[in-house]
């Protein structure tokens, strides 16, 4: 396993302490070994559902799935992939709300391994630190790139920013479509799920919370 950054370690410990870390283990194998193992098992799965892997459209699918699982859609299970974060001292004494709206969210439902597709809004009131705006998108993407439930994902994003920015004054709002509802089971193509998490002034002050919700829904 690759070494993880101090920021990643702080965030992971915070999630573990609060009991909202994703249920996961640390694999003993390196990435190549894991990809090979997944490929082998996916070949068996595809055969069991009745697919002919001799077809040129299917023969490389197990390889593609293994690479996708390890290197892409579940890469957030490895804290070595946590975004590089450099806190910037708040020398300008920014005291107004910083809001990043409509951050693209693509995750995977941990119950059925199908897509969760939506948008995230993140806001905070700076104290000692600010961070680059793109880092907000990257942190959201990191926690999305793992099997998830939306409620836990929302809380993880909140606590990650509270930990990195060293402030409780953070708000997170997630609106997403779950393809486990859309393409199977009830097959509801219209519904979406909204979750939110508030800390500090967003939790304690109704007007601040109202301002945030008004801004993100304009």
UniProtKB/Swiss-Prot annotation:
Recorded metabolic or biological pathway in which this protein acts: Cofactor biosynthesis; 7,8-dihydroneopterin triphosphate biosynthesis; 7,8-dihydroneopterin triphosphate from GTP: step 1/1
Binding site residues for Zn(2+): 109, 112, 180
Reactions the enzyme catalyzes: GTP + H2O = 7,8-dihydroneopterin 3'-triphosphate + formate + H(+)
Enzyme class (EC, first level): hydrolase
GO-annotated biological processes: one-carbon metabolic process; tetrahydrobiopterin biosynthetic process; tetrahydrofolate biosynthetic process
Pfam families reported in the protein's UniProt record: GTP_cyclohydroI
GO molecular function term, any single one: GTP binding
GO CC annotations on file: cytoplasm
Disulfide bonds: none
Keywords: GTP-binding, Hydrolase, Metal-binding, Nucleotide-binding, One-carbon metabolism, Zinc
EC number from the UniProt entry: 3.5.4.16
Record's keyword annotation contains Nucleotide-binding: yes
PANTHER family reported for this sequence: GTP CYCLOHYDROLASE 1, GTP CYCLOHYDROLASE I
Oligomer status and interactors: Toroid-shaped homodecamer, composed of two pentamers of five dimers.
The family this protein is said to belong to: Belongs to the GTP cyclohydrolase I family.
Name under which the protein is recorded: GTP cyclohydrolase 1
Organism: Pasteurella multocida (strain Pm70)
Name of the coding gene: folE
